[in-house]
Amino acid sequence: MTELEIFNLIMIFFIIVGAGIFILLFFVSAPYGQHIRKGWGPNINNKLGWFIMEIPTVVIYLVIYLIGERKTTMMSIIFLIIWMVHYGQRTFIFPFLIRAKQPMPVTIIIFGLTFNGINTYLQARWVYKLSQPYPNDWLLSPFFIIGLFIFISGFIINLHSDRIIRNLRKPGETEYKIPYGGMFRWVSCP
């Protein structure tokens, strides 16, 4: 079996598992944040848990980039920068800004670690080995320009939304609060 065949099987597996989890989450609340409860195994500090969940996104991507055959092309370097900006922030900055005191179940950490590890392999291996090489003129293609615009918009929205959530409670408050403002205007339901 070739690596591309294994890659495609993992993609099919991800689609099937993703659809199953999507349906399951209509009936079961994932046990973190306000929904944390007993029965999901031991808990650890949520900052450490988030860091552990996200670290594969940086390490695996960087390793695949470094062993990849296309690491010196301009597009490969740009993809590396885009990935590292997003996941560097999610791994090394976001967890340490979390104000919530609730612990995180190790089970959730294992699920996140597994997803992030496999997803990072799929993304990096595609870019640096399995796809056709991205030529430098692809930088000016509508696909890249639109994709970069979506990424930058999403990154800014993500940072802003994280800030709103961090500032929901005043020091000493513990009750659940519904976020509002920014994009929460479209997704929150009181």
Indicate residue ranges for each PLM-predicted region.
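Membrane-anchoring alpha-helices and their flanking helix-loop junctions
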Residues: 1-185
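Kinked, hydrophobic transmembrane alpha-helices enriched for aromatic residues
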Residues: 187-190
